[in-house]
Amino acid sequence: MLPAPLARRLLCGFLRGPTPIVTRNGVRETLLERRCATDYSSRHSAGLGRGLPRGATATGGNPGGADLEESFLFPEYVLDSESEATLQDQLRELQQRQEEEERRIEQQREERRQQKLGAGRRVHQVVGHPDPTVPPSGQNCSGCGAELHCQDPGVPGYLPSEKFNSAVAEEGGLERTVCQRCWLLVHHRRALRLQVSQGQFLELVSAALRRPEPALVLYMVDLLDLPDTLLPHLPALVGPKQLIVLGNKVDLLPQDTPNYRQRLRERLWDECIGAGLLPPRGYRRAQRSSGDRPRGGEDNANLPSKSSTVLRDVRLISAKTGYGVEELISALQRSWRYRGDVYLVGSTNAGKSTLFNTLLESDYCIAKGAEAIDRATISPWPGTTLNLLKFPICNPTPYRMFQRQKRLKRDATEAEEDLSQQEQNKLNLLKKHGYLVGRVGRTFSYSEAQKDKAAFEFDADSFAFDMGNEPVLAADKSTKRVELTPEDVKDAHWFYDTPGITKENCILSLLTEKEVNIVLPTHSIIPRTFMLKPGMVLFLGALGRIDFLKGNQSAWFTVVASNFLPVHITSLDKADTMYQKHAGHTLLKVPVGGEERMAGFPPLVAEDITLDEGLGESEAVADIKLSSAGWVAVTPQFKDTLTLRGYTPQGTVLTVRRPLLPHIVNIKGKRIKGSVAYKTKRPPALMYNLQKKR
C-alpha cells in the first residue's frame, strides 16, 4: 500500500490529467460519456422491465437488447509526457526527503553518543579553598595514611579548609576522616594529581626499613607484569632483612596445564634470583632455557654483584579472592611468629592495600583491631597509599594456633550448601572475578562484653598462656565505636602497608583514570586466540601493535589482557590508516577522547623481533609483553622462524620473555567460520578450603 502523502499526490494528478478512455465492443469512448449512458440505463431500467411481456427477458423482447447486456469496464489511464515527468519528480523529491530524514536521525544518534562520552569525561568540581595559615593536624588519613591538613591541595592528606576547620572544632572530628583524594577515589573514581615524586616514596619506604629492630619484608609482585614488577634496586632497598615474595593476582590467570601453579611458582623463584636476591641454602635453581635470555645480550648487567637480602620463600596468592591467604598466615605464624614488625612492600597496582584489608579481617590481626581500624583506600589508580598504614599483629600463642587449626579443619569439611546465603553469594561473586577462590575467616572476634569494658581490660597478647583473657569465639559485630587503648598496643608488633613504588617506563602513567579502569584486568582473563598469516597486523586497543612480517606458515597469536581491551586484526597496508582514523575512538577504545586526546599521546615506536624454532601448535615459543597493557603469546608451527615488529607508546617498554603460560593456545574453542579468530573458552573456577557439592 502506498503511503498516504504519495497516494494523495497521485489522486490529485489523476484528477488534473486528461480524461480516461474506456473501450467497449472495440469502440473507444471517454469514461465520462460511458458513465452518463450507464446512469441513463439505470434510471430507465425499471420502466423497461415493466413494459415487457410476462416471461420475456430484457434482451429477448427488445431488438436492441444487445446494448443492455452486462459488460465490465476496465479504465485505461493514459498519461501524457508532462504528467509522467511530474510523477517522477514527486518520487525523486520523496526519496530525497527520506534520505534527509535518515541523515538527521543518524546525526541525532551521534550527538547522543558524544554526549554520553562527554558525561563519562565530566570532571567533578573540587570545592573548598586551602588555608596556608592553619597548621597540620597531626592526625593521619585513615584511607592512605597521609597527615591531614588544609594548606596545599597538591600535598598528600589535603582537606578543604572549610571541612578541616569544622572537623577540628569537634572533639575527635578528624578521627577516621579520609582526605579529599581518598574521597574522590572511592566515590567518584577520580584521582587528584599530587606533587609527590618517586624519590619521596622511596625515601619513605627506605626510612621505614632502616629501623634497627628485627623486621620481615613481604614483597608483593604482580604476576601479570613479570619481570617488570621486580624493582632493580630491591636488594639495596630491603638490605639485610629477611624477605618473602608474594606473587599476587594468580586468580586472573587461566589454567593451561594441571601443574601450572607449581610452574608459576618456580618461574617466580627464577625471576627473583635473577633480580639479585639470594636464595636460601639448599635451593637448586632450575636451568634457564635459551629463550629466557634478556634482550640485547645482557644478562642482568645492571644488577648488583653482591646482595645481603635472603629470599626465604615464594608464595602465590590472590589478595582479592583469598586464595593462598590462610596458608600465608599459617606460614608467618609458624616461621616468623612474633619476633618483630612486618612490612608490605611493592610497586604500584600490585594489590598491597587489598591484602592489607584482607589480613585486617583475618587471624593475623588482633580481634579488636578489625573493629577499631579503618580499611585502606583501594583503587586501580597507581599510588593510592601515600604513607604508612598499620594494624597490630596477633601474638600466635599455642592456644590461639590450636583453635585456629580446629577452625581450618572444620571449614575444610564444609560444602557450599552448608554455608549461609550471604557466604554463598560472596563466593559466587568471587568465582566470577577469578579462577582460584579461597575462604579467609576469623577464629576469634571481639565480643559485646569486651566492647563494654574495653577501657578496663588488660591486653590479651601480653599474657600468652592466660587462657581467661583470650578473645571469645564467634560473636556478632556491633555498631558501637571501638578504639584501641594503650593497653591494647603495649609492646605490640605491627603490620605496615607502605606506599607503592612507581615503575619506570610504565604505560599506566600515560593513562587517565577511566583508561586505567579499562586496561587493568579485574576479572579472570579469557584468552583470545587468532591465526594470522604473514602480512597481517594485530592491534591491542591503540596501546600496542604487532606486525607479522615474515614466516613460512601461519601462526597462532593468543592475547592475554583485560577483557575490556579490544583486539583488532587488519592487513599491513591498512594498519597505519586504521590507527590514524580510529585511535582515540570506539573501535580501539583506549585512549579515550578522540583527536584531542591523541594529540598529547605519545606515538607508537617500533622494535623488530625474531622468534626461532617453533615448538609446534600446542606450545608458545615467547610472550611479547606490551608494557603493562598485556601480552601476546606467539605459537609458530614446528621449527618455523617468525619475523615480527612490535609497537608500544614512546617512553614505555616492550619485553620479549619466556611464555608465562606456554600452553595457553589450547584454551580456545572452534575457529569462527570465515574469520581468523577462535571462539573464546573460560575454564571453570576452582574453590579451595571447601568440599564439593554433596
From Swiss-Prot:
Q: Which residues carry this modification: Phosphotyrosine?
A: Y77
**Entry's SUPFAM superfamilies?**
P-loop containing nucleoside triphosphate hydrolases
Q: Is ATP-binding one of the keywords?
A: no
Summarizing the function annotation, the protein's role is: Involved in regulation of mitochondrial protein translation and respiration. Plays a role in mitochondria-mediated cell death. May act as a scaffolding protein or stabilizer of respiratory chain supercomplexes. Binds GTP.
- Positions of region (Disordered): 38-69, 93-138, 280-305
Q: Which Gene3D superfamilies match?
A: P-loop containing nucleotide triphosphate hydrolases
| Subunit composition and interactions | Homodimer or multimer. Interacts with mitochondrial complex I, DAP3, MRPL12 and MRPS27.
Listed disulfide bonds for this chain? none
Give GO terms for biological process: apoptotic process; mitochondrial ribosome assembly; mitochondrion organization
Occurrences of domain CP-type G (ranges): 202-504
A single GO CC term, please?
mitochondrial inner membrane
Entry-linked InterPro entries:
G_CP_dom, GTP-bd, Mito_transl_resp_regulator, NOA1/YqeH-like_C, P-loop_NTPase
Molecular function via GO: GTP binding
Which cellular compartments is it found in? Mitochondrion inner membrane
Superkingdom = Eukaryota
PROSITE patterns under this entry?
A: G_CP
Compositionally biased tracts (Basic and acidic residues): 93-114
PANTHER family in the record, alphabetically? NITRIC OXIDE-ASSOCIATED PROTEIN 1 (PTHR46406:SF1)
Record protein name field: Nitric oxide-associated protein 1
